[in-house]
């Protein structure tokens, strides 16, 4: 049996992707020109994985990000802003993540970054380019500050090691002792952050 799903066409993906989030319909993101038959085959092929993943996510404690009349900052509910909520989240993310980058780069002596970009990538929380551009998901501002700080430190460490070599991980462990705890938080609650529709 094919699981029910919402199909979204995006020019930003090269191949179809399945997104499973708690208390949300399964979403299939496909490049333009993908046929209904191809989507059907994809869902059939991954049906068992979708069922397992859905059950796993539903069993996890929810943050309640989708509670009506609520916005979130630093892992805590706050009074919702008036107007465009995503724009508000992006503004908060730029302000808070920039402050985190400035603070952590000074603490670690990593000053090779050039600029900060705030976006909404679906497959990573942050990235670091060879030219020193640090990119972050605005959704990090919803997570506790220590989790967002972990992502900032992770990307700053890439200024020294543009890979995930043993040297990179050794540097990250020394720079951010709570790295494993932050990674676990993102594994548990990341799908709920990605499902947030402000």
Spans of features found by a protein language model:
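Active-site-proximal or metal-binding-adjacent scaffold patches in catalytic folds
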Residues: 1-150, 159-198
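Walker B catalytic acidic pair
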Residues: 155
């Amino acid at each position: 049996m094919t699981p029910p799903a919402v199909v979204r066409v995006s020019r930003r993906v090269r191949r179809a992707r399945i997104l499973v989030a708690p208390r949300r319909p399964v979403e299939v993101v496909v490049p333009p020109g993908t046929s209904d038959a191809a989507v059907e085959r994809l869902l059939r092929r991954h049906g068992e994985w979708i069922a397992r993943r859905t059950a796993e996510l539903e069993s996890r404690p929810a943050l309640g990000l989708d509670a009506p009349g609520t916005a979130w900052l630093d892992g805590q509910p706050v009074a919702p802003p008036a107007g465009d909520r995503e724009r508000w989240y992006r503004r908060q993310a730029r302000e808070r993540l920039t402050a985190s980058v400035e603070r952590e780069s000074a603490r670690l002596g990593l000053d090779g970054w050039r600029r900060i970009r705030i976006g909404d990538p679906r497959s990573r929380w942050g990235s670091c380019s060879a030219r020193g551009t640090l990119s972050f998901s605005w959704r990090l501002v919803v997570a506790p500050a220590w989790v967002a700080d972990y992502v900032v430190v992770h990307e700053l460490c890439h200024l020294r090691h543009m890979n995930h070599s043993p040297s990179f991980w050794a540097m990250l462990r020394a720079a951010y002792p709570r790295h494993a705890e932050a990674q676990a938080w993102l594994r548990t609650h990341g799908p709920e952050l990605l499902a947030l529709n402000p």
